[in-house]
Amino acid sequence: LSSSSAASDVYKRQTIFVPERMIVSVVCEEADYQAVEAQIAFLLKNLYPSKKIVKERSLPELHLEKKNEGFMDASQVQYVARAGNYVRHGFSYHGALRILKVIMGYDYLWINVRVKGGAYGCMNSYMRNGDTYFVSYRDPNLKKTDEIYDGIPQYLADFKADEREMTKYIIGTISDMDTPMNPSAKGARSMTAYLQGLAFADIQKERDQVIGATDEDIRGLKDLIASVLEEKNLCVIGNEDNLKSQSDMFMQLKNLYE
């Protein structure tokens, strides 16, 4: 290392590993906490001295770039992903998205991507910060799966479920939310809530929205999902010949193992 880069490295360490930046998550019996607290105090003493420059924790500004990449390999299947962010388009998180995940996973995506399409599986997720994705894995298709994703808004516009069907979806959603957790999992959940700035009221609101959801709430997600898909963010890992034959779907193709 040059002297300037070495000095920069030291400066970074001295501004990162300071008491103000330390977060500790402890999961233990109350009787054991005193011993843990002593270890935390010891660690604090061995960090770099405070420079009094830490005002608040914030993420660095990220400059996102749409690439629509296809990564080619020798496999005979694809992993097809579409992603986007609904918050960027003015939408907010709603507990009905929890139910949508169940509906997609056991109905629309499962039937079209897994059963009819022959993929090994499929996933979907809707995060509080707006990040959303739809993914297939070990999928013999590419463009067909992408078109299935594009069909989600129309599926939602036409969605109908009677009280019995909605109750089934709600029970499936709540069972996922109420999965039994060991102490470690509870600690991880609490840490995540702290880092995300989630209060108990936020979690209760989500639960109330799930329990009180109707098929109208599911139909109401159409525009939110459409906003994500309209971003046309695509990433695929799959067979070289398949990707090259459908290269118009991508902005760039790369060998996966380069």
Set out the residue ranges of the language-model regions.
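Bilobed periplasmic-binding protein-like "clamshell/Venus-flytrap" ligand-binding domains
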Residues: 20, 219-238
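M16/insulysin-pitrilysin zinc metalloprotease superfamily fold
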Residues: 40-57, 109, 124-181, 201, ...
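A glycine-rich, aromatic-flanked flexible loop/lid motif
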Residues: 67-82, 114-131, 138-149, 186-192
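Short, conserved charged micro-motifs
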Residues: 31-38, 91-94, 142-147, 244-246
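C-terminal structured "cap/appendage" subdomains that terminate the fold
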Residues: 195-227
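Single conserved hydrophobic/aromatic residue that forms the stacking wall/gate
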Residues: 1-7, 11
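His/Glu-based metal-binding/catalytic segments typifying zinc-dependent metallopeptidases
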Residues: 14, 21, 25, 30, ...
